[in-house]
Amino acid sequence: MGAEYEPQTFGQPVERNENPSIRTRDPEKYFRPSRLPIKNTHLNNFEFFNPYYEQNYNEIKLPATLTRTPDGTVLNYFSVLREAENLTQNQLGGCGTVGMAKLPYPIAYNFFTEDYQRRVAYDEYLQSFAGIGHINVIKLNRLPDEKGFTPYFIELETIEGLSKGVTYFAYYYGYIQLKKVHNLYKIDHMKLYGEDFLCAAYHLWQHDAEAVVATMYGNWCNLIKKQLPTKQDGYVKTIDFIGTDGADYRFIFYELTNNTDVLIS
């Protein structure tokens, strides 16, 4: 999808005194898909695509309105790609033309900075969508600015094809980095992780926010004097504790569609 890709990692078994009492209380939740509303709905008029028929990616000039704000850049990028399709002979789906077919890809490629385009050639970019017939943005959060860059956390829901002719939902989370170029915000890097729905229900504890804090900062570091109740607002989990060193600590996690938790700050 134009990003570096890695499977979701949950950590490896450790030799420290892992607490066997830390168990998933509701394993069924790890198998359930998302019901969140989608966010990439900025382009509901398909006439937007009319000027770009028969144009190569290097002939396209995006309207400046699409990249004037950081939020706008991310949501417009994925709005362009929402109904893009790159199904293959080995990854089939649908019953005829799907969405806007491959028309959106050269348009979306122009949301990248020139430097990112040098790092990710167009053919490689197109191949990163192989098997995908639909993309929804279901979570989007701006993170604290870094020097020269504006980062975002994102979670995507895709519909993908299989060789046996069925389609399935897949979920990815990751990070997008924007760079301001001539007063416009362009995508300078993306990295996505595929979500696994069969690991957390059976193995490890690194996917559970409360277990991460209790194990790493309590059992291992003896840093927790008093851990306060977890606060949850939607998919954002906040865990506070008072340290044995007298300091106050706060950890923020995002809960993914597969109900695993990712440490954000």
Q: What positions do the PLM features span?
A:
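Exposed beta-sheet edge and beta->alpha loop/turn motif
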Residues: 1-44, 145-265
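Short, low-complexity N-terminal intrinsically disordered segments enriched in polar/charged residues
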Residues: 2-98, 102, 201-206
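Core segments of small alpha/beta cavity-forming domains
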Residues: 52-131, 212-265
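Short, charged low-complexity intrinsically disordered segments located at boundaries
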Residues: 105-112, 138-143, 156-160, 207-208
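A short, amphipathic edge element
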Residues: 126-149
